[in-house]
């Protein structure tokens, strides 16, 4: 398991190597919650996924990502919002062995 470094801003994109895979993760706040898009090798694999506490983001292996992503509330079980991203709400990369 690995924490992906994010900042408490309303919209951001990070590029990171996850299990040897080139990934870009976009995280953005809307009025209805925090959302995420995931690119694998510059190809969009999931878009507009509502980020929920301890719920996988990619969910299906057929998308090609080895492992998965999930936000975890460090202080309880609230749904993530951008003001706490990077401190209260951490984005984890879950390796295959973590699933």
Predicted regions and their residues:
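A general secondary-structure signal for short beta-strands and their flanking turns/coil
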Residues: 11, 31-33, 86
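Short, charged/polar N-terminal "headpieces" of proteins
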Residues: 1-26
